[in-house]
């Protein structure tokens, strides 16, 4: 079975939107892919690529690890060319490279995915004459040659050039199909449909549908999508809260529903997945190996941005009935571990990852994020100055069985804040394998030793200094946590980049660091 690998590993602020593709395109374990610079970084790092230093023409770097033992690195450059480099995952030695030029002028790369050694790229182009956004796709061999020609695959009429196209792409788990559609920042009207076009790997269109959802008292704004192996599509309402630059966050409201559309029988089915007396804060959904849909996330008892527990809903395959629907509150002991005595809920936690294991177990990973303000007054002028701090703190993990019960819950202490909301070195990277789970992040060097003392439960604060370490936290399948220092960031004056998360074969963990227009990949011993 061919498996597509999609990745958005960026040196700076993300331009593309690949994160939603990861959960639908992988059937294997996630791995951390990061950037680094020297073979002398740490005894835990051994093999490194040759890398790039101070290349001013380098815009972004994206990478992917494949089943056939290759690490694919794609460099986007200012001249519009893409450099495709291939390395052996075992030794990280270069085994090939090619240069890909855009097939036409004014194309904007929106998405790409890799199946075996064929790279499929999806572009958008603003058509000023026709007042529309045109979408094209092209396939390239590993030698950089264009397969066939540039294909026109979608379009959307516009009232003026949009700030961004809103083009989205979802792959089936077996990577034999992908669907294109537009999901813009502006909420849809009741009468507005969603225009889907589904293709196979050869860019042959399988079906097309302008899907209009059933009328409802409240308009269901759909922002979650899944494509199953048969080519049918699932949709789910609700836009999850994001870690925004604002210091105020409003939880979701309104009707919460999921839909199933079979393009071959034209059947549209609706599922009500809301909680009657509770507030759904954030959810994700994914397909398991049986093609069942797993919906899981956080809920609140008080209709504020405070998490009270987890919810789990399982839909039978191919638009079947609801197999399981339940919610589970956090235990008092876990809330005390996270927040201390006297608390009943967890504040400011955002759902980042939903992992569905082969055993049917579901793992939810969320991070505590909030914006704080500090106001100071200049004693001479009386002028007030406001400092905003963007805080990335503890991470929590919950493992749920198929009955929605918590098998284990883990707190991973972490404290970070930055004054720059566009700094890519904050937060964390998550990976899953058959052996368990791993979280990697930049950390103060005193944290590991400090947390080894059972009397101290707070990590030391890291604020962006390169006099720091990269911490690796491992969680076993039974919920046992261990914390080690992966490498000392001081040696090369570089920082771990958490945006660089990808999928690949179990057993190949590749790490690294980035700084401006420089990068390098390394893997552990």
Regions found by a protein language model. Name each.
Residues 63, 67-77, 117-129, 175-188, ...:
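Short beta-strand elements that form the blades of beta-propeller/WD-repeat-like
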Residues 54-55, 93-130, 150-162, 212-222, ...:
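Blade-loop segments of beta-propeller domains
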Residues 352-356, 361-372, 376-378, 393, ...:
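Loop/turn-rich, solvent-exposed surfaces of beta-rich toroidal or solenoidal domains
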């Amino acid at each position: 079975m061919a498996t597509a690998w999609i990745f958005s590993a960026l040196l700076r602020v993300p331009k593309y939107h690949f994160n939603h593709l990861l959960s639908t395109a992988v059937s294997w374990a996630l791995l951390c892919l990061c950037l680094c610079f020297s073979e002398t970084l740490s005894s835990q790092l051994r093999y490194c690529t040759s890398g790039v230093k101070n290349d001013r023409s380098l815009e972004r770097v994206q990478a992917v690890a494949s089943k056939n033992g290759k690490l694919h690195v794609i460099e986007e450059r200012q001249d519009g060319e893409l450099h495709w480099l291939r390395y052996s995952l075992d030794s990280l030695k270069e085994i090939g490279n090619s240069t890909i030029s855009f097939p036409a002028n004014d194309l904007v790369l929106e998405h790409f995915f890799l199946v075996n050694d064929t790279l499929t790229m999806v572009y958008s182009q603003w058509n000023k004459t026709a007042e529309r956004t045109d979408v094209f796709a092209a396939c390239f061999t590993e030698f950089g040659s264009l397969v066939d020609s540039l294909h026109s695959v979608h379009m959307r009429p516009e009232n003026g050039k949009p700030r961004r196209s809103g083009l989205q792409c979802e792959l089936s788990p077996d990577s034999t199909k992908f669907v294109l559609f537009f999901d813009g920042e502006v909420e849809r009207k009741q009468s507005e449909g969603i225009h889907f076009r589904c293709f196979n790997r050869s860019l042959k269109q399988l079906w097309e549908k302008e899907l209009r959802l059933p009328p409802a008292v409240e308009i269901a704004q759909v922002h979650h999508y899944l494509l199953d192996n048969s080519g049918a599509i699932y949709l789910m309402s609700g836009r999850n809260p994001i870690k925004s630059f604002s210091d105020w966050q409003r939880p979701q409201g309104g009707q919460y529903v999921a839909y199933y559309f079979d393009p071959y029988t034209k059947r549209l089915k609706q599922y009500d997945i809301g909680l009657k007396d509770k507030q759904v804060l954030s959810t994700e959904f994914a397909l398991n190996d049986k093609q069942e849909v797993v919906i899981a996330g956080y809920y609140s008892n008080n209709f504020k941005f405070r998490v009270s527990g987890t919810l789990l809903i399982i839909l039978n395959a191919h638009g079947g009935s609801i197999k399981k629907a339940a919610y589970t509150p956090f235990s008092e002991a876990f809330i005390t571990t996270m927040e201390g005595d006297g608390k009943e809920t967890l504040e400011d936690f955002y759902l980042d990852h939903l992992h569905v294991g082969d055993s049917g177990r579901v793992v939810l990973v969320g991070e505590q994020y909030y914006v704080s303000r500090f106001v100071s007054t200049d004693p001479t002028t009386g002028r007030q100055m406001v400092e905003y701090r963007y805080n990335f703190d503890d991470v929590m993990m919950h493992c749920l069985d198929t009955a929605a019960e918590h098998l284990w819950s883990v707190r991973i202490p972490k404290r970070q804040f930055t004054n720059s909301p566009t700094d890519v070195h904050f937060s964390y990277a998550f990976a899953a394998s058959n052996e368990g789970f791993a979280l990697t992040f930049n950390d103060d060097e005193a944290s590991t030793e400090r947390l080894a003392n059972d009397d101290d439960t707070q990590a030391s604060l890291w604020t962006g200094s390169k006099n720091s370490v990269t911490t690796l936290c491992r969680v076993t399948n039974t919920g046992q946590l261990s914390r080690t220092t992966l490498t000392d960031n001081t040696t090369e004056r570089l920082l771990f980049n958490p945006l660089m998360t990808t999928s690949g074969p179990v057993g190949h963990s590749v790490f690294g660091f980035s700084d401006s227009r420089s990068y390098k990949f390394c893997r552990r011993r």
